């Protein structure tokens, strides 16, 4: 099983690398340079900022609307559904069509993460390998689910350079428990994927973390306060996205026009705030290493939340994992700036709260505090952030859980089940 897990890790890593390269080529075609979406948006005139996300949304919607029309619905559509409640069979053709749609959305500036389709493609590799093995040997449903889970762990690792968090993500969120029977193959798959990805992109932190130290015991209380704020903000963010989905559904527009409308909203916001384009890696690194006025951070946060709700609510294929990190960083920076103004001695480095805020809001939305702690640690490669991160993540999780609001993945599973019940039989070509 471990050897098969390593093979899945290799295949999953190569699939995510191929997706990255396709995305890079699309962005190069759009801007003539590989400079990132935010830099591209800043260089465009206002009318192009409005037009590009709209056209990208329309193309993404057409890809979904007509690409899925003739595909028989065999297997689960989402990797979490295939692992948690399915038989481990993931529809390869649906995954490819949805990934193509995601390419159009992400490359044109939609406020969603590229990591969602990357994980889906890697999980698809695990499902395909399991189906091939079935012809040579008996493979139980439990083993099929584990193979898909190995692919998902490889995909998360490839997307975030976080092999430990990738394995824990699947255990904590999908399986609901960490056991030695599942953790071993997941770690092998994640480590294999990490080795391959680093051969292409090198070894380095996703977010370069500035140095900071605790200066007093009082600072612990300020991080607990940040966790409390993130725990209240998480359910509000997810609720806003759900309301946006409902609003788009009530328009009764065809799928292509809904995605185009979502792109139009993102484009309109980007005329004033181009930082809403894409997943926001460059903006978060800017939060950490450049001075920002709190008014500017607040404006960027509000517009980013609106852009994410518009993109995800319209039905664009992509994750909200990375936009959540963006919103957490902005929330943490605002909180740290306020604490520094009120208690300079207890909050000497406001940007440290940006990193901790990412983990706290992630824990509040995923209900997975251990994964959130490990994810931020591996993305920053900074041990000094772990202690305040643990405090804020646990506080954020407990606060969000106390509200009774479901996690982002529980909402997604429930939504997928409802959609499956409403779907008519597929058309024949």
From Swiss-Prot:
Topological relation to the membrane, as annotated: Multi-pass membrane protein
Gene3D superfamilies: Clc chloride channel
Keywords (A to Z) from UniProt: Cell inner membrane, Cell membrane, Chloride, Chloride channel, Ion channel, Ion transport, Membrane, Plasmid, Transmembrane, Transmembrane helix, Transport, Voltage-gated channel
Annotated GO biological process: response to acidic pH
Transmembrane portions of the chain: 1-21, 44-64, 146-166, 168-188, 200-220, 221-241, 259-279, 283-303, 315-335, 354-376, 383-405
Entries under InterPro entries matching the protein: Cl-channel_core (IPR014743), Cl-channel_volt-gated_ClcB (IPR023790), ClC (IPR001807), ClC-type_chloride_channel (IPR050368)
Family recorded in the similarity comment: Belongs to the chloride channel (TC 2.A.49) family. ClcB subfamily.
PANTHER family: CHLORIDE CHANNEL PROTEIN CLC-E
UniProt-recorded name of the protein: Putative chloride channel protein ClcB-like
Species of the source: Ralstonia nicotianae (strain ATCC BAA-1114 / GMI1000) (Ralstonia solanacearum)
């Amino acid at each position: 099983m471990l050897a098969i897990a390593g093979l899945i890790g290799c295949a999953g890593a190569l699939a995510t690398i191929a997706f990255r390269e396709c995305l890079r080529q699309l962005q190069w075609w759009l801007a003539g340079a590989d400079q990132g979406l935010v830099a591209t948006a800043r260089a465009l005139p206002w009318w192009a900022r409005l037009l590009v996300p709209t056209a990208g949304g329309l193309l993404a919607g057409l890809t979904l609307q007509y690409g899925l029309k003739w595909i028989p619905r065999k297997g689960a559509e989402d990797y979490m559904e295939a692992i948690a409640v399915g038989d481990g069979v993931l529809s390869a053709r649906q995954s490819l069509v949805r990934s193509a749609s995601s390419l159009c959305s992400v490359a044109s500036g939609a406020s969603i993460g590229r990591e969602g389709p990357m994980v889906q493609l890697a999980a698809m590799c695990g499902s395909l390998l399991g189906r091939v093995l079935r012809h040579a040997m008996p493979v139980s449903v439990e083993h099929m689910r584990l193979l898909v889970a190995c692919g998902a762990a490889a995909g998360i690792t490839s997307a975030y350079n976080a092999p430990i968090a990738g394995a824990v993500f699947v255990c904590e969120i999908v399986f609901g428990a960490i056991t030695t029977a599942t953790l071993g193959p997941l770690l092998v798959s994640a480590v294999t994927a990490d080795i391959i990805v680093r051969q292409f992109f090198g070894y380095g932190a996703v977010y370069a973390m500035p140095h900071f130290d605790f200066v007093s015991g009082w600072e612990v209380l300020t991080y607990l306060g940040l966790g409390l704020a993130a725990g209240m903000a998480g359910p509000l963010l997810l609720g806003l996205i759900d309301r946006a989905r409902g609003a788009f559904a009530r328009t009764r527009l065809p799928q292509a026009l809904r995605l185009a409308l979502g792109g139009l909203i993102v484009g309109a916001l980007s005329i004033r705030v181009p930082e809403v384009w894409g997943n926001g890696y460059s903006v978060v690194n800017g939060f950490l290493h450049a001075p920002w006025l709190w008014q500017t951070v607040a404006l960027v946060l509000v517009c980013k939340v609106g852009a994410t709700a518009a993109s995800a609510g319209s039905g664009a294929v992509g994750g909200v994992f990375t936009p959540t990190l963006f919103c957490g960083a902005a929330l943490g920076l605002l909180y740290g700036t306020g604490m520094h103004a009120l208690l300079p001695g207890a909050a000497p480095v406001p940007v440290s709260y940006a990193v901790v805020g990412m983990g706290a809001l992630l824990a509040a939305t995923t209900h997975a505090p251990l994964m959130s702690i490990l994810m931020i640690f591996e993305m920053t490669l900074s041990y000094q952030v772990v202690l305040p991160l643990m405090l804020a993540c646990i506080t954020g999780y407990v606060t969000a859980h106390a509200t009774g609001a479901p996690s982002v993945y529980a909402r997604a599973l429930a939504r997928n089940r409802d959609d499956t019940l409403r779907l008519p039989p597929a058309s024949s070509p």
